[in-house]
Amino acid sequence: MAEETAALSTEKTEDTSTAPSTSAEKADGIDIDTEAKRLMGAGQKHLVMKDVRSAVNLFQEASSLLAKQYGETADECAEAFYSYGMSLLELARLENGVLGNALEGMPEDDEEEAEKEEDPNIPSADNLDEKEREQLREQVYDAMAEDQRAPDDTSESEAKGKPEGDSKDKEADEKMKNGQKETEKVTDDLKIDSASRDVPMDKSGKGEPPESKDAETLVEQKESKPETLKEKSIETKEKDLSKEKTDAKETANQSPDSTEVAEEKMDSEASESKESTSIPPTENEANKPDDPEKMEEEEEGEDSEENEDGTEENEGTEEKETEEEDVGNLQLAWEMLDLCKTIFKRQQSKEAQLKAAQAHQKLGEVCIESENYSQAVEDFLACLNIQKEHLEEHDRLLAETHYHLGLAYQYSSKHEEAISHFTQSIGVIEKRMDVLTKQLEASVGELVDEVKKEMDELKDLLPDIKEKIEDSKEAQKNATVTEKALKETLVGGSSGFSKENGSTSSSSAVEKSGDSTVPVTNCVSDISHLVRKKRKTEEESPLKDKDAKKSKQEPVANGAGNGDAVVPTNEEAEKAEEASMETATVESTA
C-alpha cells in the first residue's frame, strides 16, 4: 500500500510540474496582447494630440510584437498595420508640407524671454533710468574721443598685449639682421681680395699677394664658427677666385694684354659674387630649418586635410548607403496598408470588409501624395463599391469617398467626373442633414447636442465642396477655350495657306486663258502651251508665205466652215507696228 501511495504522489507531482509550463505560455501570450493593446491606445492618444512621430513609434512597436507572436499575415496584426500605415501617411504629409521640418526644434520667443529674465548676470537696458542712460552715452562719447586723440597709447597697449608668438617673430628678425651683418663682412673680405690684384707677385712664383693670406685667415676663422651651407659655398667661390688670380698673374709676365683681359674677368666675377652674397641671406634665413614647430604645424595641416578628405568621402558613401537602405514614409505606409487590406479582405464579416474599404481609401490618399492619380482613382472606386454594399445612402463615409474621387479626377484634369463626384458628395451630405433633422425632433437630452454638433460639422463641409465644384468648372471652361483657340489657329493657318494657293492658281489660270488657247484645266507643271513656235526660215519661197498670209487674212463668218471658231493671232498687230515704223523713218529722212 505504501508503494501505491508513493506512486500516486509522484504522478501528481509530475502533473503539477507540467501544468505551470502551459500556464506560463498563456501568460506570455496575454502579456504580449496586453502590451500591444497598451501601445495601440497610447498611439491613438498621440494622434489625437497631433504628436505624430511618437504615435508612429508606438504603432511600430505594437505591430512588431504582434508580427513576432502571430506572423505577418495573421488576422491579429491587421489593426496594428492599419494604424501604423495611417500614422506614416500623416507623418509624410507633415514632412512634405511647407513648414513640416522648418519649425521643428526651433525655440519659442516666450521661452527665450523667460530665460533672459531669469539670468541675473546679464544687465538689461529696460531697467535703466533716463539719467543712467545719459551717463552711459557720455562715457561712450568720451571713450571714443580718447581713442581719436591718443592713437599712440593704443598702439603701445596693443604691443604690450601681444602673445608670446610676437617674441618669436622678434627673434627671427634679429637672426635676419645678424645674417645681413655676416654677409657684409664677407663682401668686405671680397673687396680686400679685389684690391690685392694690383700687388706684385711673390718671389716663389705662386702668384699669391701678401694681403690674400690675411683674407684666407679671416675665412678660416669664420669656418670655425657654425655657418650655413650657402656661406660654405661662398668660401669655395673665394678660393676659386684666388686661384684664378694666381693664374692670371703668372701669365702677366708673358703678355701684358692677357693680364688686362684676366683683370677684366676678375672684376666681373667679383661684382657677381658681391650681388650673390648680398641677396642670399634672406633666402637662407627663409629656408633655414630653425623653426621645427612651423614644420610640424605644416605637416599636421597636410595630414588634417588628408583626413578631412577621407572623412568626407566616407560620409558620402555612408549617406548613399543609408539612402538606399532607408525606405520613405510613403512607401512604407503603402506597404503596411496593402498588407492590412489583404488581411481584411480575406475575412467575410461586414466590419472586416468596411475596414478593407478604409484601407483602400488610405491607399488612394497615399497615391495622391505621390501624384499617382490613376491608381488613386482605382483605389477610391474599390472603396466606394464596398461601401455601397454595406452602408446606407446617407452615410458620411460615402460623402468622403466621393470627395476624394473628385479630388483625384480634378488633379488628373478630368473635370466632368470631378464635378459629378463633388455633387454626389453634396447630395449625400444633404440626405444626412435630413436624417439628422428628423432625429432632432425625436431626440431628447444629450442626443440633441450630439446631433447639433454633427449638423454643424456637415454645414461647414458644404462651402469647401462648392468651391471645388466652381474651380473645376472654371478649369473646364479654360480648357475648352484653349482647345478652341488651338483648333482655330491650326485650322486658320492651313485654310489661309489653301486660300492663298487657290487665289494664285485662279489668277494664273485667268491670265493663261487670256494669253493662250490652252484650257484652264491643264496642270500647273505643264508649261508647253506657253512656248511659241519658231518662225519659218528665209529659205522658203516668198510665194508660199504670201499665200499663207492671204489664207489667214480671209475672214470667216461666225458659224461658217466646220463650226470651229477662228483663233485670233498677233500677225495683224505686227504688220501695223511695221507700217508705223516705216512711216516714222520716211518722215525722219524727209
From Swiss-Prot:
InterPro entries on file: NASP-like, Tetratricopeptide_SHNi-TPR_dom, TPR-like_helical_dom_sf, TPR_rpt
Cited SMART domains: TPR
Pfam assignment, any one: TPR_8
Positions of TPR repeats: 36-69, 357-390, 399-432
Ranges where the record places region Disordered: 1-30, 102-328, 492-590
GO BP: CENP-A containing chromatin assembly; DNA replication-dependent chromatin assembly
Highest taxon in the source lineage: Eukaryota
Keyword terms, alphabetized: Nucleus, Repeat, TPR repeat
Protein name (database record): Histone-binding protein N1/N2
